């Protein structure tokens, strides 16, 4: 039996808990999962890498690859292509719907298309790729001191390094700049990193569990 998981129409950090709850219930019910994104109207980098992490978790359960229906709105579908989502998604999902040909955008508001992070070398490549373009936007458009942009690169590096050190599997990162009219009415840069790995506790337990004994926990 196929279990349906609706992808929120507005898929970002605010709607992710709703999506995660639906995913959890569907997994508990058993059967093949169908992620339905046909009605998607917008997705932040958080939503895109979160959907990939859900597909990764579904594959880890075993059985057939989860299904994914693509957005039907041409503009939304085009953005997902430009953001590099489908290049990663095709390794996890059986995709239903026509995906237009195209490559991730080289110069646009997508500072870093969805990019796989599996090893330390990937982290260095990600930071090197994005640093110059990010600096131009952070200092030129957001008015941040150029020296302070180093903190942006460090935050990106640390977030990606957590995948390498604590996930026990691969993950993804995406970075985008856009005008956030609804909440801030200004231009923002969003970093999103996700994986469906074992997490901090399980990754540290072999060394820290014995050290702290009964005091070891979340």
Language model regions located:
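Conserved beta-strand-loop-beta-strand hairpin that lines the nucleotide-binding pocket
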Residues: 72-82, 87, 164-218
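A contiguous, low-structure linker/loop signature
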Residues: 78-121
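Amphipathic alpha-helical interaction surfaces in cytosolic regulatory modules
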Residues: 7-90
